[in-house]
Amino acid sequence: MIKASDFGPDFLWGVATAAPQIEGAADLYGKGTSIWDSFTNRKGKIKNNHKLGVACDFYHRYQEDIALVKLLGFQIFRFSISWPRILPLGRGEVNQEGIRFYHHLINECLTQGITPYVTLYHWDLPQALEDEGGWTSFSINAAFNAFVSICALEYGDKVKNWIILNEPFGYTSLGYMLGIHAPGKTGLSNFFPAVLHTALAQAEGGKILRAEISQANIGTTYSCSEIIPYTQSENDLLAAKRVDSLMNRLFIEPALGLGFPTADWDLLEKFQIEYGTWRLNDRMKFDFDFIGLQNYFPLTVKFNAFIPVIQAWEVKAKSRKKPHTAMGWEINANSFYNIVKQFAAYPNVKNIMITENGAAYHDKLIEGSVVDAERIEYFELYLAALLKAKNEGINISGYMAWTLMDNFEWAEGFNARFGLVHTDFKTLKRTIKYSGYWWQEFLRN
């Protein structure tokens, strides 16, 4: 049985959240409309037509929730600053009530001995900017840079740990190519410009923080999945390379000064030629202090000529009779180890933090308790895999569990429960699950 002490005395343990998923107060206290506010109001976009609305009401209950972070024994609380809460129209006039809220939240963390890790963009783009094209518009970069600068000047004396973007592949692919997340756009004509402007934003945001906050610890996060070919046929191997270049390499390689990974996917080569991205390589490069990795599942893929764009198809865990979570995501701790090793192999990756990792299950509150033994087993498996990678010499400085409490899980609405704490979405009562108590004991020892 692994122990927290096995990771060493300097290893950091935390729990992660995101503003649009927990805050609530979606149209209160001067906050502007976000693309997720708009998207959830479109019928059929979210399971059971759930809307953000109150969410977990973290805005009014943050003291209670920070107390839970402390009670469970975590050192770090990762949260995001809502862009439309600070700048209701995305630029221009600042909402002082929003500014005050995050001052209060940061102060509460510090008072409780919790280190805040602040994410600057966790998918809640102001709708006013989306009306101008959102991430497909070149003007988005100036607006984002101004937002970053405001946050740095307001909070930089109290917050030293910053994350520029959360999972850029997630919001560009799901929101601007497949249309299943906000803002619901589709096609490569939206996806490629969003990719380019996002790659610029992650670097330029880092440069602003570096200039404005002394001793800042600056990172950004990437979703990552080991891509496994279904067979060793040439077609499946090439399909896996294409998917890997898209899902794992698309944003980290520009940040490392390598440009976009065009070698294994001809459409990326065409994108580079059309947009002249090689001319922007220096602007897309930034020397991050840490890279945040967010892993939930591997992806097994096979060649399929009828799938547009990527000519690859996922072979689901269930069809391969592999263990999986309530989301259908394969449980494979060895693939977690493999993908950490893959990212660590880049010469310029100095430090890795696991900024999200967790699992959704069909949790039930029965007689005041949530017995989520499957989630405990999941964490035991994945932490053992992480320790193996760390013991092999990879510089891994911390781990953040996703997530503190059940919340709004994007297109899944309130159906997918990832929390260490159960949320009753009718009463908003919090109940620590067995997995939360497991973490408490793990960190105590």
PLM regions: where:
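Glycine-rich, proline-tolerant flexible connector loops at the mouths of alpha/beta enzymes
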Residues: I81-V94
